[in-house]
Amino acid sequence: MARPHGTRVLGERHIRTGLAGSALAKGDLVQSTEATGTETINNAATNVAVAGFTLEAISSAATGDYDRMRSGDQFWVYVTTGTMQASEVGKFCDINNELGVTLTESNNDARIMGWDGVTTNFAIVEFTTPESATPTVLA
């Protein structure tokens, strides 16, 4: 059975603190921007470099912790659109919103690394810098 969205599968935790640009729930997929020494985190959107997953609910304009991703880190994520199956492993997927991914290959936001073989709405993914032609890199 799949673990909750945002559960780390591979790689060490890298806890960072950021200022929430909007209200965030625990486990939200976030992107990051830095300006004048302040790191601001917001819900992730497709075609951006993903910063990590929130470790707690964070009110808008408040600071909170998130698990920062690094190259090679893998996480369980919720598949919001599409049906996870063995043929999807090794393919790319796109961020749908802060709560999950869609099994399309338009922006190539993450690579599907595995699944539990049963649960069709969860996958193990490795987030990478988007491989689309014109990525907007915010992290």
Label for each model-derived stretch:
Residues 1-139:
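Surface-exposed, low-hydrophobicity beta-strand/loop segments enriched in small/polar/acidic residues
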